[in-house]
Amino acid sequence: MTADLPLPTSKDYTAESVFQPANLLREARRQRNLPDEPVPRVCLLDPDGDIAAHLASTGRGHRHTGWACYHTDMWVTDLAGTAVGVVARAVGAPFAVLVAEQLFASGADLVVSITSAGQLQPLADPPYFVLIDQALRDEGTSLHYLPPSPWSALPGHLKARLEPALHDLAEPVITARSWTTDAPYRETRAAIASAIEIGATCVEMEAAALYALAEARGLDIVCLAHITNTMAVWGTLHIAEEWSCCCTLLLYS
């Protein structure tokens, strides 16, 4: 078969979707007999699952009984007097955006993603955090929210409030660009070199799509990368012990 298979190109970025997260959540609550209970105003995406596991194993969190997502559970914990909802293992751009859409439809005002990432350019000795201010759109999900462009970005008002507070943390948090990919096992030498050449300092799988959602919908989303390894040299990931300082920063900024 040699014929080209064209991708759909009829994208109207201002048109409303026929399939809405609120409708799915309503049906999930009906089918599963769940209460119509809003989620905390601040919610955290935990792609690696370490934070949720930490809350479960230490008794510092409890399950949210009204979270109606078919694919995930939510743990709720108290951080500096504020309830925070944690959703684990929404890995990759499509899944992360699906869950983020459902979080906002369920009452969230701020969604934070903290994911482990591979270091492309050394900014400090790992482990350290990167506040992702721009993400290279090398994934497919963002194209359903915004017209094609190289980068998607942290909302400007959030960047302006967060950056001044970064200097007060013991754990290094550095503002920098990332490369968002859909295919971690296709990070070839040429692809890595290209990403580095245009300024990406780390590689992860969610930020570009989450920031596209934020821009398209006028939502508050912050993406942090926890730099735990260099490319092709994977170390043990330890996020749970260090997540609290970053979340506290976000809550008080």
Regions found by a protein language model. Name each.
Residues 1-112, 118-253:
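Accessory terminal and edge-of-domain segments that mediate assembly/interaction
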